[in-house]
Amino acid sequence: MPTVDDVLEQVGEFGWFQKQAFLLLCLISASLAPIYVGIVFLGFTPGHYCQNPGVAELSQRCGWSQAEELNYTVPGLGPSDEASFLSQCMRYEVDWNQSTLDCVDPLSSLVANRSQLPLGPCEHGWVYDTPGSSIVTEFNLVCGDAWKVDLFQSCVNLGFFLGSLVVGYIADRFGRKLCLLVTTLVTSVSGVLTAVAPDYTSMLLFRLLQGMVSKGSWVSGYTLITEFVGSGYRRTTAILYQMAFTVGLVGLAGVAYAIPDWRWLQLAVSLPTFLFLLYYWFVPESPRWLLSQKRTTRAVRIMEQIAQKNGKVPPADLKMLCLEEDASEKRSPSFADLFRTPNLRKHTVILMYLWFSCAVLYQGLIMHVGATGANLYLDFFYSSLVEFPAAFIILVTIDRIGRIYPIAASNLVTGAACLLMIFIPHELHWLNVTLACLGRMGATIVLQMVCLVNAELYPTFIRNLGMMVCSALCDLGGIFTPFMVFRLMEVWQALPLILFGVLGLTAGAMTLLLPETKGVALPETIEEAENLGRRKSKAKENTIYLQVQTGKSSST
């Protein structure tokens, strides 16, 4: 009886049908970018200082320039008007409406030295140095409330983590297509609700809801496209699908530049996603999932449609279509199996660390660019472009060099780039951007390749469990990253870079402790997984190597 892969070899592994589905689903991949890293623009913190009643009137009466107004009325400004905690979060406790104040150094008429003036917190809000708006300027998320910006982004990653526990079940129980449509609808609605949220708390809840479903939408699209194409195209298709996310990053920089108001920006990236609901008529259900649910008639009908669109004749035995069974998957997996043997324990711990560190490095470098860049939009744009050569490097090296050395080298490069950035003066901004781009490229390579290695190191019956548990550390890393970046920068601006450097270098060294899996048969049992790197299993090598190329993580 023919399997889906057997039929695809005859009706087209990547024909017109697959190309059309691929392009449509890539739009979903691109739409995740504003959700994943939109904090860079939505949560942009401009220069700010306390608003003082009477200062504007005094400035107008005296004819001060903005620089003179700041110099006379704002405490703690450096020699070059550099921002500090005092200048941004404290104010002179002075009645600026009193008529005795002079226009030339007005505070000198009150005290001989400004340092003798009492200071107090900003009680009347802030003045922001920006023509646009962000959640920071609208809800005054600065000074004592600055941590709420971190929480805004952490809620997205918390949503990713919670959603992964539910969405995978929905996709396996009710189908990839239904899961895609439902999560897309909720993602779109929650995105619009975020844009119109009346207060910070409701905005936070809508953002959490969006995180819970948006990654599920992305994964559903990933699973569908990898199940539509033949085995020879799955790996390349999966990498290109992830590249579509990079296209979304590049486009986000342009959209954010054109729309500096955060509410309109949020609407601009949310409203178009309602069009994905039209996929109900253009993207069919996965034949593989239908076969797993014993719905053979509908699976056969879809395979006939694929053959027709590809201009091929379906095989005569198509009605006997079946799903290839894997006897090893009849064994029930448990969390303890991930730590049952010495090598499995080692692999699990290392993979958890790799997932955690690559999430921190990838998101952390994006946020660091947003917080320190001279030109937010250009710096974000340039650092996003480097993800394209990163994908090319993966395609070139994955079968020629392997997995372990590229992952280790990429981690080491990222860590070294972060540490070098500490010693680069601000005047050499181009060099800082170059190093940030180099680190971003390394983090991108790791993020994409660790997914494949994770699937190749576990035996079949715990492969999906291993993928789910280890990749959960990616979402946990994302939860902590905003606090690591923004709160540590308040202590010392270079402190996050030191942390990133240590994480990257440690991850690079730990990666070398993993066995190379290039060309090695996918392990079927715990014994085979335990012996990876010691000897190559010859059994089923030809057929299982095809599974290695598919990246079975797509089913998680």
Curated annotation (Swiss-Prot):
Reaction equations catalysed: 1-methylnicotinamide(out) = 1-methylnicotinamide(in); dopamine(out) = dopamine(in); serotonin(out) = serotonin(in); (R)-adrenaline(out) = (R)-adrenaline(in)
Disulphide-bridged cysteine pairs: none
Entry membrane topology: Multi-pass membrane protein
Keyword Coiled coil listed: no
pH relationship of activity: Optimum pH is 6.0 for the transport of the drug quinidine. No transport activity is observed at pH 7.5, possibly due to the protonation of quininide at pH6.0. TEA transport is independent of any pH.
Modified residues (Phosphothreonine): 543
TM regions (residue ranges): 22-42, 151-171, 178-198, 212-231, 239-259, 264-284, 349-369, 378-398, 404-424, 430-452, 466-486, 494-514
One GO molecular-function entry: norepinephrine:sodium symporter activity
Effect of residue 475 to E: Decreased MPP(+) uptake, no change in MPP(+) affinity. Decreased NMN uptake, increased NMN affinity. Decreased choline uptake, increased choline affinity
Residue(s) carrying Phosphoserine: 334
Motif (Proline-rich sequence) on chain: 284-288
InterPro entries recorded: MFS_dom (IPR020846), MFS_sugar_transport-like (IPR005828), MFS_trans_sf (IPR036259), Orgcat_transp/SVOP (IPR004749), Sugar_transporter_CS (IPR005829)
Positions on the Extracellular side per record topology: 43-150, 199-211, 260-263, 370-377, 425-429, 487-493
Summary of activators and inhibitors of this protein: Phosphorylation of the transporter leads to changes in its substrate affinity, resulting in a regulation of the transport activity. In contrast with human ortholog, ASP uptake is stimulated by protein kinase A (PKA) and C (PKC) and endogenous tyrosine kinase activation. ASP affinity is induced by PKC-dependent phosphorylation. Inhibited by cGMP, most likely through a cGMP-binding protein that interacts with OCT1.
Effect of residue 296 to A: No effect of PKC-induced stimulation on ASP uptake. No effect of PKC-induced stimulation on ASP uptake. Significant increase of the ASP uptake by PKA activation. No effect of PKA activation on ASP uptake
Tissue expression: Expressed in kidney cortex in S1, S2 segments of renal proximal tubules as well as in kidney medulla. Expressed throughout the liver lobuli, in hepatocytes surrounding the central veins. Expressed in enterocytes of villi and crypts in small intestine. Expressed in brain, in some white matter regions like the corpus callosum and in the granular layer of the cerebellum. Expressed in Sertoli cells in testis. Expressed in colon. Expressed in tracheal and bronchial ciliated epithelium in the respiratory tract.
Posttranslational mods: Phosphorylated.
Induction info: Down-regulated in obstructive cholestasis. Up-regulated by treatment with pregnenolone-16 alpha-carbonitrile (PCN) and by overexpression of pregnane X receptor (PXR).
Extra remark beyond the main annotation: Involved in the uptake of clinically used drugs including diabete treatment medicine metformin, neurotoxins 1-methyl-4-phenylpyridinium (MPP(+)) and iobenguane and platinum-based drug cisplatin. Metformin competitively inhibits OCT1-mediated thiamine uptake, leading to a decrease in hepatic steatosis. Plays a role in the anticancer activity of cisplatin and may contribute to antitumor specificity.
Comment field on protein domains: A large substrate binding region with partially overlapping binding domains for structurally different substrates is formed by several transmembrane helix domains (TMH) including TMH 2, 4, 10 and 11, and it is alternatingly exposed to the extracellular or intracellular side during substrate transport. Contains one proline-rich sequence (Pro-Glu-Ser-Pro-Arg) that is required for transport activity.
Role summary: Electrogenic voltage-dependent transporter that mediates the transport of a variety of organic cations such as endogenous bioactive amines, cationic drugs and xenobiotics. Functions as a pH- and Na(+)-independent, bidirectional transporter. Cation cellular uptake or release is driven by the electrochemical potential (i.e. membrane potential and concentration gradient) and substrate selectivity. Hydrophobicity is a major requirement for recognition in polyvalent substrates and inhibitors.
Name of the molecule in the record: Solute carrier family 22 member 1
Organism per entry: Rattus norvegicus (Rat)
